[in-house]
């Protein structure tokens, strides 16, 4: 029996106005090529870097949220390698004194250990086409945080879930959009395969995976590939692999570098950055409620375990729910049900995100409250949702259209008698124990009330009138 051992290196683009070591704008996505550059990020002679305080603070927020140990000073190093989109021929990164060591992230019933977090600058972007390579250096020098896990992950599904959890965490902290589509969350995976109980196998790295699906597919293929090699009695070679989306296969890029190949040495143009303990405590106090804390609170409010998990790790839904709950207009579980089913379904159908609509927490809470109190039927409530999504007041809609549930038993009994008289065969079938025939009678009454009666009440009154049950 073989098992996989997986570790991740996650690169997160930090949400700052300017780059890591210069004043160029950091919002490179969609900009004209090579318009967000200066002598510092182009590596021109004599240009000196200056650390971005906001980027450092963002890194501290993540380190503290994960429970990592933060040193009293940060030291930056030069990581030397040659590639066309790295204009300085070195990357300013961190080596032996990173931003954080240790810590962990909850994943189900266990925790994935964090090895280290460090700050660094991003490289530019190469575009290969028609025998040429074009360079866009807008991204060069953008602030990144790299998070490295211990090899605690066992399956491709766990790796994908870990990345989704990290994305939710940094979005909750407000330090990164972490959008894979915009290149703001990228992952390298390290994977080896071994027989259960044996020492770790030879590690293979798969580089530059830019979607959760790609991470899962690349790992699935690579685990199969390594397992087949071991079953043939051969040895896996240490290498750096790429992933081809179309075929779903990994392919060798180059022999994997060792640490010494990068010739790390302290960045001579940057003195150590002190991290005073009072600054660290100030950052700690500013941390918001973290997703796993939010999940525990939702469960304490009576929200089902799986629903609480999905809501807590979907920041837009969590923010919405947290504004709706204090209003006291609907129960927590009912709000959760509507958000995860009806609202999510309508958003998917329209290709919208929640924040792109005019749906307010109060509007949804009022609509759900109308249904919970029995003032409108489920069918009516769901029919009003598209208009409430556009900012309409559900209570006003119900008033104006006369959509309130018909709860007057006297009026309903008259309609029940009419239905029985109009459908004598169905009524007789119910009397003879064929309860399924009751549905036709219920439907007749519901049509008379334009769907505004409670089906359970109509059923009870019909059974009473027919002398059944």
UniProtKB/Swiss-Prot annotation:
NCBIfam families xref list: gatB, PRK05477.1-2, PRK05477.1-4
Organism (species): Thermus thermophilus (strain ATCC 27634 / DSM 579 / HB8)
Keywords: ATP-binding, Ligase, Nucleotide-binding, Protein biosynthesis
Lineage top rank: taxon: Bacteria
Lineage of the species this protein comes from: Bacteria, Thermotogati, Deinococcota, Deinococci, Thermales
Subunit structure: Heterotrimer of A, B and C subunits.
GO molecular function: asparaginyl-tRNA synthase (glutamine-hydrolyzing) activity; ATP binding; glutaminyl-tRNA synthase (glutamine-hydrolyzing) activity
Alphabetical list of Pfam families matching this protein: GatB_N, GatB_Yqey
Record gene name: gatB
PROSITE patterns: GATB
SMART domains given in the database record: GatB_Yqey (SM00845)
Claim: ATP-binding is one of the keywords in the record: yes
Record's function text: Allows the formation of correctly charged Asn-tRNA(Asn) or Gln-tRNA(Gln) through the transamidation of misacylated Asp-tRNA(Asn) or Glu-tRNA(Gln) in organisms which lack either or both of asparaginyl-tRNA or glutaminyl-tRNA synthetases. The reaction takes place in the presence of glutamine and ATP through an activated phospho-Asp-tRNA(Asn) or phospho-Glu-tRNA(Gln).
Reactions that this protein is recorded to catalyse: L-glutamyl-tRNA(Gln) + L-glutamine + ATP + H2O = L-glutaminyl-tRNA(Gln) + L-glutamate + ADP + phosphate + H(+); L-aspartyl-tRNA(Asn) + L-glutamine + ATP + H2O = L-asparaginyl-tRNA(Asn) + L-glutamate + ADP + phosphate + 2 H(+)
Similarity section: Belongs to the GatB/GatE family. GatB subfamily.
GO biological process: glutaminyl-tRNAGln biosynthesis via transamidation; translation
Protein EC: 6.3.5.-
Protein name according to UniProt: Aspartyl/glutamyl-tRNA(Asn/Gln) amidotransferase subunit B
């Amino acid at each position: 029996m073989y098992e996989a051992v997986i570790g991740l290196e996650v690169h997160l683009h930090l949400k700052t106005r300017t780059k890591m070591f210069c004043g160029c704008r950091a919002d490179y996505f969609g900009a004209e090529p090579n318009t967000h550059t200066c002598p510092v990020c182009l590596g021109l002679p004599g240009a000196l870097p200056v650390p971005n305080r906001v980027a450092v603070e963002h890194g501290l927020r993540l380190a503290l949220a994960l429970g990592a140990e933060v040193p009293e000073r940060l030291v930056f190093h030069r990581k030397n390698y040659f590639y066309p989109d790295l204009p300085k021929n070195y990357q300013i990164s961190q080596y032996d004194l990173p931003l954080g060591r240790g810590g962990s992230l909850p994943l189900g019933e266990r925790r994935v250990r964090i090895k280290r977090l460090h700050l660094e600058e991003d490289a530019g972007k190469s575009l290969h086409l028609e025998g040429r390579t074009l360079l866009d250096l807008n991204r060069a020098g953008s602030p990144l945080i790299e998070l490295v896990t211990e090899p605690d992950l066992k399956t491709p599904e766990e790796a994908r879930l870990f990345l989704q959890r990290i994305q939710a965490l940094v979005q909750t902290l407000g330090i990164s959009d972490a959008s894979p589509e915009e290149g703001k969350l990228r992952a390298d995976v390290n994977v080896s395969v071994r027989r259960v109980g044996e020492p770790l196998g030879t590690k293979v790295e798969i580089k530059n995976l830019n979607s959760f699906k790609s991470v899962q597919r690349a790992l699935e293929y690579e685990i199969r590939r390594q397992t087949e090699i071991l079953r043939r009695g051969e040895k896996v070679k240490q290498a750096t692999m790429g992933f081809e989306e179309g075929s779903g296969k990994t392919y060798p890029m180059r022999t994997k570098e060792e640490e010494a190949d990068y010739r790390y040495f302290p960045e001579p143009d940057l003195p150590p950055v002190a991290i005073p303990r009072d600054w660290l405590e100030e950052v700690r106090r500013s941390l918001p409620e973290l997703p796993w804390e939010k999940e525990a609170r939702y469960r304490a409010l009576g929200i089902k375990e799986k629903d609480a998990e999905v809501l807590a790790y979907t920041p837009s839904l969590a923010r919405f729910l947290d504004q709706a709950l204090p209003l006291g207009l609907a129960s927590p579980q009912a709000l959760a049900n509507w958000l995860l089913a009806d609202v999510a379904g309508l958003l998917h159908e329209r290709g919208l995100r929640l924040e792109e609509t005019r749906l307010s927490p109060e509007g949804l809470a009022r609509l759900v409250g109308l249904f919970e109190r029995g003032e409108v039927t489920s069918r009516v409530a769901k029919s009003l949702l598209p208009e409430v999504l556009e900012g309409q007041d559900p209570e006003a809609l119900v008033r104006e259209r006369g959509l309130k549930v018909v709860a007057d038993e006297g009026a309903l009994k008259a309609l029940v008698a009419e239905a029985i008289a109009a459908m004598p065969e169905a009524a007789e079938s119910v009397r003879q124990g064929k309860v399924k025939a009751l549905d036709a009678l219920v439907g007749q009454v519901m049509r008379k009330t334009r769907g505004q009666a409670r089906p359970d009440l109509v059923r009870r009154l019909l059974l009473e009138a027919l002398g059944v049950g």
